Curated annotation (Swiss-Prot):
Residues 355-400 are annotated as: Interaction with ESR1 and ESR2. There is a cross-link at residues 111, 119, 244 (Glycyl lysine isopeptide (Lys-Gly) (interchain with G-Cter in SUMO2)). Pfam families: RBM39linker (PF15519), RRM_1 (PF00076). The modification Phosphoserine is found at residues 97, 100, 117, 121, 136, 334, 337, 341. SMART domains: RRM, RRM_1. Keywords: Acetylation, Activator, Isopeptide bond, mRNA processing, mRNA splicing, Nucleus, Phosphoprotein, Repeat, RNA-binding, Transcription, Transcription regulation, Ubl conjugation. The modification N-acetylalanine is found at residue 2. The modification Phosphotyrosine is found at residue 95. GO terms for molecular function: RNA binding; RS domain binding. Belongs to the splicing factor SR family. GO terms for biological process: mRNA processing; regulation of mRNA splicing, via spliceosome; RNA splicing. It comes from Pongo abelii. The lineage of its organism: Eukaryota, Metazoa, Chordata, Craniata, Vertebrata. SUPFAM superfamilies: RNA-binding domain, RBD. This is RNA-binding protein 39.
Amino acid sequence: MADDIDIEAMLEAPYKKDENKLSSANGHEERSKKRKKSKSRSRSHERKRSKSKERKRSRDRERKKSKSRERKRSRSKERRRSRSRSRDRRFRGRYRSPYSGPKFNSAIRGKIGLPHSIKLSRRRSRSKSPFRKDKSPVREPIDNLTPEERDARTVFCMQLAARIRPRDLEEFFSTVGKVRDVRMISDRNSRRSKGIAYVEFVDVSSVPLAIGLTGQRVLGVPIIVQASQAEKNRAAAMANNLQKGSAGPMRLYVGSLHFNITEDMLRGIFEPFGRIESIQLMMDSETGRSKGYGFITFSDSECAKKALEQLNGFELAGRPMKVGHVTERTDASSASSFLDSDELERTGIDLGTTGRLQLMARLAEGTGLQIPPAAQQALQMSGSLAFGAVADLQTRLSQQTEASALAAAASVQPLATQCFQLSNMFNPQTEEEVGWDTEIKDDVIEECNKHGGVIHIYVDKNSAQGNVYVKCPSIAAAIAAVNALHGRWFAGKMITAAYVPLPTYHNLFPDSMTATQLLVPSRR
């Protein structure tokens, strides 16, 4: 059995060697495969490790960057906090809080800080910094002046253009003085200008200069300027005739009006005193022009009394306005009872010769004025007058009226212009020195240069009145020069200054039309 086994082993030995070789080869291959696998695994592990390392590095970099950013932010916050703390310290050092209560604990206060009310009080208690500019001074109200003082600084303007604005009037009157206030009178329903206004100046001296601008064109329309302060007539007789304590409407008579005055102008003048119910301006049916008188009805009698006191004698368009109470009666005027009749209240009044006489007498009462002697004789007659007497009386009254009109026209001064004439400056018969006209010319130039200058001057050596003609660069300069020279004494004579219309001056001296340069005295 053992031999059999050995023989079989011997027979199977070469096959076993081949199998061992194959197995060894297979084992070697398996080992190489394992090695290759392990190598590939190690390589993949290495790759994974490198990737993870790179990821870790990138994460670390990002963390470092974020940390650096946070550090920068924290540093900037700390810097800001330190700056704000330093500012607060400076602020607290400069401005102490008025709060004197107990201090707040940091544990209690935390991040809230002081209460809001204390912050407000601290803000309110700030004192002015020395580097801060002071506020502009508060303008004083114009009401610190009395009404009389304001009236003395105010002028009344009429005949204004429909499209005029307060700014236009302010610019126009600023040539004669500083304007404080401009008040346009407008219709309360349509809000349109009534063509009248009140202009108040800062200085009283500007009022006469502004009145001298009458006739100058503003937006193409010649303006009329009058003083606004009425000539107050507080006579005892007129005051006693008014019905004291009466309530309700009151009617006033308004006379001696210019023919160009309209109802809107009267409303603008009388309406500031109170509400007006009606205005009736009597018109001529033939010519269509105003008869120069009318009636105004106030809703309140007290307003009518104030208007009567303030506006009686008020100069309007060169005429003193007459204001009277329609229903007043006097003991000596029984003949004028028809003026107060109910028929008059309903239909108005149509004055004839007798009516005019009675009206003149009534208006003269309490004013100190005297009516013509012929009118007094007519009023003393009993009820009626013969036709011939009336005609004779009317003729004499018309003559006296014409004479008074001529006298008034002679006394009216011409409108202010750039040109004026000085009289009594020299006597040509006594002047013998060489160049005496040049000396007078230099004297006038020196004096006018104080008020705005001269652009043209002419000494009329052959004038018996000693005339010197002057043209100024502006109307305001001419007004100032005329006011300064008129009435002064020169060489033993009183100087007389009078305005000369601009076209007349240019006709006399054509070279003055192009003169624009201010003159200086020839002597040095």
